[in-house]
Each structure stands twice: as C-alpha cells, then as structure tokens.
Swiss-Prot record:
BNR repeats lie at residues 228-239, 276-287, 317-328, 512-523, 589-600, 631-642. This is VPS10 domain-containing receptor SorCS3. Residues 1144-1219 are cytoplasmic. The lineage of its organism: Eukaryota, Metazoa, Chordata, Craniata, Vertebrata. It comes from Mus musculus. Residues 34-130 form a propeptide. Plays an important role in modulating synaptic transmission and plasticity in the hippocampus, probably by affecting the trafficking and localization of AMPA-type glutamate receptors in the postsynaptic density.
C-alpha cells in the first residue's frame, strides 16, 4: 500500500509517503545539466500528489521596489503552503512524463486574440512536434531537473557580468516590441557543473541560495561544488566556497520548514561525513563532524531544532539542537518508514512512529520518544507483525498491511484509535492499493483489482477510513521514471469536490469530471469554437474534450494541468478534442468556471503560470529551442500580449514563480550557449500593472454544475477580478466567497458500503451483502445505526430535505449466536518452533463480541478462557514445550448458541498448495474415494494427515488418496494436511452424506466468466444466489437443494436434489417426490426461468448442461445387486470415459476436472470429484493428478489461478509488495 503522488512515499511497499515541504531534485534533460529547488526540507521528502498540482513553499522573494508605496511599511505576510494530499502502495503515483514541442519564433511585438490565426500558425499547417524525453532521477528521494546548455555558436554572456533590460518598446514603424525589465547573472566558473539546488525563502527576505555541483555518474558521487548567495533578490550573487571550506564538497542543501533562516548543508559522504549549519540564511556556517553517513533528514513540523536523520546503514538518529549533537534511536529501520508525531493527535510532540525489522525478517510498528527509546519505553500500537514497508502515518490516519495465507488485509487507525480492518467490497480482491488523499476527513484510494492490468478503481471511504465504496472504475495508470505508479486523477484546487479523471472505456481513454466527489461523472463539453473562431462540431458522448492529467516531474514547468487555491474556478490544461485522449494533436485549454465550459488558448504546448491571485497569466512555449519572449494575458486567456524578457535567446531549462500569489517576479534559468555559464534571469512584472484594483474592478461568479447552483450541498458565490482589469491586488487581499446551504437532494448522497447504484439514484444491496446483519461490536441491549443504503457525501453541507429519509436508523442490537469461528496463527503458518511463542488469532464472522465467552485449548494440556473478545484482539501467545502435532480448539459460546473451530499445529521441503478433492454429496455406508493433489509435485516423500469429522486422531498415509465410509447422514468435515520437510499446508472440505440423491450439471451465460475471480467465497455466494433463484421459481424446499459451483472456467456448477431431512419408512413415496422435484427444476431451467443479476447491468441465465440427468443414487441392496443395472452401468462408464477423453476440451463442464485450481485460500465448500457428475465414475477413470497440472491442459497459469487461454483478463493473486 502506498501514498501516491510522491517520489519517496512514506507508506506502502514500493513507494514511501511524501511529507510536507522538502527539497526537490528532478532531472529534465535538455543538454545534460540539472537544477534542483530547495523548499522547506530534505531531498527525500517532497510532496506533489497526482491528484493535484504541487503547492510548494515560496520560491522567489518580493523585492521592495515591487511594493506599492503604501505597502512599504506593512508587515510581510508569510505564504503558507496548503495541506497536501498524497497518492501512496499503501503505492505511490507521481507526475507524468515531460514533452516539448519545436516551433518557430513568432513576429515580435504581436498581440494575439483567439479567433485570429496565432503567430505560430501558418494557415492550417501544423509544425512537427518533437517530444522532449524525460531523464532519470538522480536519486529516488529527490527530484532533479536539467538546466540545458544552448546551441553552439551563440555568443556566451560575459562571466560574472550583469545584464539589465528595462521596460521599453523597440523597433521601427511597422513593428514594436514590448519589453519587461529584467536582470541576468552568470554563475562564473561553474560551467562544468551539471546539477544545481536553489532555495528562495521569501518571508521578507531577499536572500537566494544556489548550490551547484558536478556529479560523476560513474563514481556515483559529487566531485566539485559551489555555494552562491544573493541578498538582492537574485540581481547579483556571491560565491561562498571560502566560508564553507575550499576543500569541502557539498552534496545537499536543506532548509528548516519552520524557520527558513536555518540552513543545513551535507558534505558528500565519499569525501567526509559532516554537516554545516547556518542560522542567518547562509551568511555564516559552523561545521560538525559525524560518526555516521546521512541518507535523508526529516524536520519536525513544529519544533525548528528537532531533526531525524536516517543513515546509510538503516539506523535512525535524532537531534534536538539542529544537528549539533546526535543520539541513536533504533537500528534496522525500514527506509522512509519513520514519521514525526502529528499535532493534536499524538500526546507527545517528540513521539516518533517507525517501522522496525526484526532479525527473523518480520516488521513491527513501534513508537517511542526521541530521548526515551530504550526497549522498555517503546510501545507497539499494533501487536502483530506487519508487512515490510507498509506503515503509513498521514494526517488523522495510520495504515498498515498484514498478509496471511497469501492474501493481504489492510488496517487503519483513525485519530489514533484501535486498528480496524479496511472493508472494501467483498470481491474487489486488490493486488495493489494507493492512498490518493486523506483530506477533509476522508480517504481516497486507488485499487487495482484481480482482473485489472493498467487501470485502477477509485474508492472513497467514510470518515474513519474503514468502509470504502466504488467511485469510478478503470482509471488509467502508467509508470513514472522510477517505476512509480501514475494514477490519472486530478483534484481541482480552490473548490472542494471537483475531480478530473481519465477513464479507460473500450480501449479508449476519456476525461470525466465530477462535482460531488465521485458520485456522478460526465464527459467534458468541447469548446464551441476553435482558435480561429470557427465552429467546433463535437457532440457528446461521441466527441468531447480530453485532458492530460499527469503533473510534471519537472518542478520548473507549470505542468500539463494547473489550478490554484488563490484562483478558484480557473483551470489550465493540455489536451485535445475528439473521441479519445491523444498524445500528438494537442493544445492548451482554459476553464474560468470550474470545468463547466472550456476555451482553447494555444494550439501547441505551453507552460502557463498564475500571477497576482490569478489576475494575470504568463505563458512560455514548451520547446527545446532558445526563446526570448513570453505571453501575458489579463482577461483569462481571451487575448495575449507578447513581451521580450532577455536580449539574447535563452535555452530555457526552467522558471520559478514566487509562491506568494501577489508576486510580480519570475526567475528563468538557462544557458545562452552550449558551453556558457548558468544564467539566472530575474523578470519583473510590476510595470505591466497600471494601477491598484478598486471595487469597480471586481465581479461575482456563481459556481454551477451544468446549471445546478447547489454543489456539495451549498451555493457558492465568488468575488474575482473582472477579465481585462489590468490592475494589481494588494498583499492584504483575501479572496472572498459567500456560501449558503442547500436542501438535501439525491445527488448529495452516495451508496453506503455493501450497496450498489441501480439507475440514477437507487442503491440496492450487492449480492454478497446482508444488510440485516449488524456489526459484531453490537451487543445485546445496545443499539446500532442500521444503514438505509445511503450515506451523505463527506464534506457535503446540505440540510433538511432528504437527509432524514436517507440517514441511518437507530435499532436495537438483536444479539446473535457465534458463527464463522476461526482460529489462525498470526503469520498464517501451521508450524511453530519448540520453545518459541506461537500466537493465535480467533476470528468470528457473526456474534456478540462483548457477551461471548472464549476458550482456547492448545492441545498440550493447557487451555485458557476469556469472558469476551476484548483481551484477545491482539492475539493469544503460547509456548509449546515439546514437539508434535497439536489440535488447537477454539470454542465460543453465548446464551444464543456456540461454535467451534480447530487448527492442527505441527512443531515439523516446502510445498506450496494442496487441493483436497472430495464429492459434494456421498451415500451413507458406501466407500468414498478422497485424494489430495499437491503443487508443485514433490520428488521426496510426503506425509498425509487425514481428519474425518471430530476425530482427534488422524489417519496417516504416504499415499495421496484414501477411501472412507461415512456411517451417519449429515454434514461432515474432512481435513488433510501435507508435511514436506519443515513445511506443512492443509485444505478442508465439507461433504453431505445422504441415503440417496439426484444431481444435474448446470452452465451459465458467458458473461459470468468475466466476473469470476475463481476463489472459494465467490463460488459459495454464487451457489447461494442460484439456490435462492431456484427456490423462488419452483418453491422447492430449501433443505432439498444444494448448488455447488466448480473451480475453473468456463463457470459451471452441479445441482443436487436431496431427500428430506426426516426420512421416514415411506421411502418409495419420498423417492417419487424426489422425481417430481427433479422434473419441476428441470422444466424451470429449460425455460430459462432461473436467472439472477450479478451487478447492475449484468444478468446471468442458468442453463441445464445438455447431458443425461443422473439417475437416483442410493445405498439400498436392491439397487446395488441388480445385474442388469450393473451391466448398463459398465457400458455407460466405458462410453463416458471414452467421450470425456476424446472430447474433453469441447465439453464445458470438463474444466472442473482438467483445471486443478490453486485457490487463494482454503475452500469454503467441497470441490468436484468422482461421483457428482456421472454415476459410478471414479477418479481413476480420469487423468492422473500429475497430468492435471501438465501437458493436457489448454490453460495458462498466471499467479496462482488457472484460466482459459482465450480469456481476455489476467488473474493474479493480490501482491503483497504494496498496500
């Protein structure tokens, strides 16, 4: 599980969770150089979720000359970065790939208005676009962005000199060029350096720090470095190498997030291990030697002197004096899985959450205080072991993953409460999960399910993060530069509830928008006219606007989509018009009303930045060619003015706009030529704002959703600057919004957990969900909230209306007898070492946790009892003094009933899977052949342990099959355990024993196969659904029907018609009744009356497989002694075996023999064997078990599930590498 959207997630396997404000280091290859921007922390802790653009701490300072006169005496307001969401596996998604386009230079002094051919257009011809390939990241815990060298032949700017361009108009009578005032500075002597890290703190400061370095990719280390400092907003720089030590080679620059005057520099570990500390914004430094090598730093979010350091040898150190002294906290810390406490949630400010690995390879979640982290003072909030790299601490939530028996379970703690298991829809069966966001007391998660390969489903949770419901299926995903997952989902900033998503529909990718957090989605309406003013003929749903939603991996470009909290409703994105998303014929589009309507502003790819609270837009062409112009718009992209910002064309490698929304400064990085020094161009926009804004310069804007004024349960009216008003806002300006609640309507509610939407608004229970079953925490005498199938969307502010109708109703807890009792070990193994702790977990599907007594007998003469489940939630530990085989028995009892569960524990060369083959129904007093198929086949000797019913002593064989006779009618349990070396696995099945029965094979409409995950629970639930459908149509008694769904594809089943439970002496009459029931069922099936709805829009029809109905099978002497019947049986068996061997690939139900399924966990019902499909046919008549797993199968095995070769979906076991 991961938090997506960062390069170093601090969450689930494969992608650590990002944290606020840290150093960025990203590579954007143009000519081999790179630049890195330092924000508020260390290189491994960036935050830039895939669901929204990165909102980062201030980049550029505001110069005093940029202030209006009346503002000079006012205090400087710090720009606070907004809270970020993380997309994590929980996995972590990151920004998208970078592309550039080549295009010719536009005529100077041009002003372009959409509707007239733009300067870059030549009639209808389009220039060839050349993709700019993204480069690899320098390190996995930071971003790197290249500063490219320019083309050869250009005159390099004089080293160390300063170029100044003032705001002027130049040119002859026919042309006139607008100029912006700018200054350029060359970093002298660093032309060989290929990396740079830039920090601009803002906060009433004019200081800029730049660390340039030469990174040798062959050696994997930094060989040269230079530190530059500016005190005049980047107009000039001073080289500080003599102040840090001429021989000191620096590798990283860190800035304290709570006090940006405090700077920390790390030396390259290949040279020395030291840290340089400054408390005056880099003017002076103190150097401290270290006894360990730092890999990453994590600053405390509140205390400016508290720092955590992670070393190269996986040890965690702490400092409480900003790196002057260090103390070892713990060893064997999982990389990136350590977190500071969260204010308001953790009791101690110096508490640290960490994931610690033990010597035996397990991981545990521990917490301790930085100065008190001895073994006696540590605590374990989750007592059991967890999966490695699965701890995520994010806002109010803590996530972990635990894998037992090959299937991962996810747990969440909300506001530091006890951990609860995350509830996804029963058959989502995730093989990968990413946490997208934890904003607004709700979790957004992207889940890749068992039948998905390049798409994810979006799920949203309740406030506690436990119950998840489906918001959108098949969202497109891709891989980033470091192999990280990119989920194409984007949250529009400034207005809550609006998301954009790229969904894969029939191999086409289309862009959808929602205004209510995923309850309803619709396609984007294309613009009415194009850039030339010609009508656009694009009709929904066949044609629409599609957008690229990946955020840029280059922090110095605006990215392909951008929106700001400070400019609500304004969205700029790259995309195309058509039937699907295109990567070639693209342009830039803008929406001024939160995505309702769109206009095209460029027909090529541009970077667009927001200035002065969104009142002005700045655009620069995204191209590898040198440029000296940029475009400015004051009317939300309706018209554009072109300005020159440098005298010589510059190969632009990136640009920084100060994070403060009222800024008028931009810094452009680049080179004038291939071998020139690095150029830093400071561009001042102050001159283009003619005056200060007045009341007459503002207008109101109503947020609508296709004309509906109520969005997320309220009407919102924003005040914004009128398009075209060329005025500047003051620093005291704060965007105003008026809102009032709406009456609750259908669209303010989503389906609750366990319910699915049918039609526009009706929520009905899913086939696997029982809405009448209360929580296990519901104790007799208490009350609980019984869902109506609906829940109000989190953060929706509607009132009255349908709120009472859809709200959950309070009901008394009915009290339930224990059911579904299970006893398992914490690691899922059935082997324990003598003298070591064996920890048991008792699980119960239904019952009253508070009023149920529990007894656990360890099988060695020791037993324990508990009055309720509370003391045993973290497991029951026991140490076995001697080796052997022990039957562990769990017994649960309350005043309504009891339940028992068994586990056979061995203290004993690994086998991976055993499949127990037994008939579903057997005849009393007749031998039943039972066999076990082991995968992979073992060359050595295997020992088989067989338990029948409640027997405490197993039958032990060296053969994989056994014959057994059941003496009494009823349901019997059969368990087999296979021991190979020190490994032990088991399978359990149930068999129904009767005097006689009849059976019939069933098949289904083909659409069921696509939705068949081929796991035991699904087969059991589908069997129950078929049984209910048969009873509904025929009114046959429930206890006389048994439906068993077979493993494998195509999906098939067997219908058993059983005698009544209370069999009397009138046997012949009952046999006649059985024949009548068979005829009734057969007629209903042949008339296609038996069908069920699997999910909305998926109707499944049940058919009779066209084979002869099996005759009555019983245990009477008359039947077994009939010579004629025996002769007919022999003939029929021979014919059947021949036909099966000859045509088994063509008979649908033969798959139940040919496909030995390696199920994801133990079967819940018995699987097919010799007697359920044709009378008197035994397993020996079919292929040997070894052949079942070998050449005769026309199947492929992916993960551990066999599927038909023609199947289009790939089935995999959910992997345990990312939660």
């Amino acid at each position: 599980m991961e938090a997506a959207g960062t390069e170093r997630p601090a969450g689930w396997p494969g992608a650590p969770l990002a944290r606020t404000g840290l150093l960025l280091l990203s590579t954007w290859v143009l000519a081999g150089a790179e630049i890195t921007w330092g924000a508020t922390g260390g290189p491994g802790r960036l935050v830039s979720p895939a669901s929204r653009p990165p909102v980062l701490p201030p980049l550029l300072p505001r110069a005093a000359e940029n202030r209006w006169p009346e503002e000079l005496a006012s205090a400087r307001r710090a720009a606070a970065p907004r809270r970020r969401s993380r997309l994590e596996p929980l996995s972590q998604a990151s920004r998208g790939e970078i592309r550039t386009e080549a295009a010719g230079m536009s005529p100077e002094g041009a002003r372009w208005v959409p509707g007239i051919p733009s300067p870059s257009q030549a009639g209808s011809a389009r220039r060839t676009r050349r993709a700019q390939p993204p480069s690899p990241l320098e390190r996995g815990d930071s971003w790197a962005t290249a500063l490219a060298d320019g083309a050869k032949g250009s005159r390099p700017h004089t080293k160390g000199s300063r170029e100044e361009v003032r705001a002027t108009r130049t040119g002859g009578a026919s042309t006139e060029e607008l100029r912006l005032p700018s200054t350029s500075f060359a970093l002298t002597g660093d032309s060989a350096h290929n990396q740079a890290m830039v920090h601009w703190s803002g906060h009433n400061s004019s200081v800029i720090l730049i660390l340039t370095k030469l990174y040798d990719f062959n050696l994997g280390s930094v060989t040269e470095s230079s530190l530059w400092r500016s005190v005049d907003y980047g107009a000039t720089y001073e080289k500080l190498n003599d102040k840090v030590g001429l021989k000191t080679v620096l590798s990283y620059l860190y800035v304290n997030p709570t006090n940006k005057r405090k700077i920390m520099l790390l030396s390259d570990p290949e040279m020395e291990s030291s840290v340089l500390i400054s408390s005056d914004e880099g003017a002076t430094y103190q150097k401290y030697r270290l006894t360990f090598y730092i890999q990453s730093l994590l600053f405390h979010p509140k205390q400016e002197d508290w720092v955590l350091a992670y070393s190269l040898d996986q040890k965690l150190y702490s400092s409480m004096d900003f790196g002057r002294r260090w103390q070892l906290m713990h060893e064997r810390i999982t990389p990136n899985r350590f977190y500071w406490s969260v204010s308001g949630l953790d009791k101690e400010a110096d508490l640290v959450h960490m994931e610690v690995r033990t010597a035996d390879g397990y991981a545990h979640y521990l917490t301790c205080r930085i100065q008190e982290c001895a073994e006696t003072t540590r605590s374990g909030p989750f007592a059991r072991s967890i999966d490695i790299s699965s701890l995520v601490v994010q806002d109010e939530y803590i996530f972990i993953q635990v894998t037992i028996g090959g299937r991962a379970s996810y747990y969440v703690s909300y506001r530091r409460e006890a951990f609860a298991q995350i509830k996804l829809p029963k058959y989502s069966l995730p093989k990968d999960m990413h946490i997208i966001s934890t904003d607004e007391n709700q979790v957004f998660a992207a889940v890749q399910e068992w039948n998905q390969n390049d798409t994810y489903n979006l799920y949203i949770s309740d406030t506690r993060g436990i119950y998840f419901t489906l918001a959108m299926e098949n969202i497109k995903s891709s891989r980033g530069l470091m192999g990280n997952i990119i989920i194409e989902l984007y949250e529009v900033a400034g207005i809550k509830g609006i998301f954009l998503a790229n969904k894969k529909v029939d191999d086409q990718v289309k862009t959808y928008i929602t205004y209510n957090k995923g309850r309803d989605w619709r396609l984007l309406q294309a613009p009415d006219v194009d850039l030339r003013g010609s009508p656009v003929h694009c009709l929904l749903p066949f044609c629409s606007l599609h957008l690229h939603l990946q955020l840029s991996e280059n922090p110095y470009s605006s990215g392909r989509i951008s929106s700001k909290d400070t400019a609500p409703g304004l969205v700029v994105a790259t995309g195309n018009i058509g039937s699907e998303l295109s990567y070639t014929d693209i342009g830039v589009f803008i929406s001024s009303d939160g995505g309702n309507t769109w206009r095209q502003i460029f027909d090529e790819e541009y970077n667009v930045w927001f200035l002065d609270w969104g009142g002005a837009l700045v655009a620069m062409k995204h191209t590898p060619l040198p440029v000296r112009h940029l475009w400015v718009s004051f009317d939300e992209g309706h018209s554009w003015d072109k300005y020159g910002f440098t005298l010589l064309p510059l190969f632009v490698d990136g640009a920084l706009v100060e994070a403060g929304v009222e800024t008028h400064i931009m810094t452009v990085f680049g080179h004038f030529s291939l071998r020139s020094e690095w150029q830093l161009v400071k561009v001042d926009y102050k001159s283009i704002f003619s005056r200060r804004c007045t009341k007459e310069d503002f207008e109101t804007w109503h947020l609508l959703n296709q004309g509906e004024p109520c969005v997320m349960g309220e009407r919102k009216i924003f005040k914004k600057r009128k398009p075209g008003a060329q005025c500047a806002l003051g620093r005291e300006y704060s965007g105003s919004v008026v809102s009032e609640p709406c009456v609750c309507a259908d669209w303010d509610f989503e389906c609750d957990y366990g319910y699915e939407r049918h039609g526009e608004s009706q929520c009905v229970p899913a086939f696997w969900y029982n809405p009448a079953s209360p929580s296990k925490d519901c104790s007799l005498g208490q009350s609980y909230l019984n869902s109506t199938g609906y829940r109000r969307i989190v953060s929706n502010n509607c009132t009255d209306g349908l709120r009472d109708k859809y709200s959950a109703k309070t009901q008394l807890c009915p009290g339930k007898a224990p059911r579904g009792l299970h006893v398992v070990t914490t690691d899922g193994r059935l082997v324990a070492e003598q003298g070591h702790n064996a920890t048991f977990i008792i699980l119960m599907e239904e019952g009253d946790l508070q009023r149920t007594n529990i007894q656990l007998d360890f099988g060695d003469g020791v037993a324990v009892s508990y009055a309720n489940f509370s003391p045993i939630e973290d497991g029951i530990r026991h140490v076995y003094k001697s080796a052997g085989i022990f039957q562990v028995t769990a017994y649960a009892e309350n005043n309504l009933g009891s339940d028992t569960a068994f586990l056979f524990l061995h203290v004993v060369c690994p086998v991976e899977h055993v499949h127990l083959r037994v008939p579903f129904v057997a005849i009393r007093n007749k031998d039943v052949n039972i066999s076990a198929v082991v995968w992979p086949s073992q060359l050595g000797t295997l020992t088989y342990f067989w338990w029948f019913g409640n027997s405490t002593k197993p039958l032990i064989t060296l053969d994989s099959s056994i014959s057994f006779t059941f003496l009494a009618e009823g349901t019997n349990t059969i368990t087999v355990q296979v021991a190979a070396g020190n490994a032990l696995i088991q399978d359990t099945k149930e068999i129904a024993v009767h005097e006689y029965f009849q059976s019939q094979l069933l098949s289904f409409s083909p659409n069921l196969d696509y939705h068949n995950p081929d796991i035991p629970e699904w087969r059991q639930d589908i069997g129950n659904v078929i049984k209910r459908a048969l009873i509904k149509v025929t009114s046959v008694p429930e206890d006389q029907i048994l439906v068993a769904v077979f493993p494998g594809l195509p999906t098939s089943a067997e219908l058993f018609i059983l005698p009544p439970k209370n069999l009397t002496e009138r046997r012949k009459g009952h046999e006649g009744d059985l024949e009548q029931i068979v005829e009734t069922l057969f007629n209903a099936l042949n008339q296609n009356l038996v069908q069920f709805e699997l999910k909305p829009g998926v109707q499944v029809i049940v058919y009779v497989t066209q084979l002869t109905l099996a005759p009555l099978v019983d245990s009477s002497a008359g039947h077994s002694s009939s010579a004629m019947l025996m002769l007919l049986s022999v003939v029929f068996v021979g014919l059947a075996v021949f036909l099966i061997y000859k045509f088994k690939r063509k008979i649908p139900w033969i798959n139940i023999y040919a496909q030995v399924q390696h199920d994801k966990e133990q079967e819940m019902i018995g699987s097919v064997s010799q007697s359920e499909n044709a009378p008197k046919i035994t397993l020996s008549d079919f292929t040997e078990p070894e052949e079942l797993l070998d050449k005769e199968l026309d199947t492929r095995v992916i993960g551990s599930i066999a599927t038909i070769a023609s199947s289009e979906s790939t089935k995999e076991i959910p992997n345990c590498t990312s939660v």
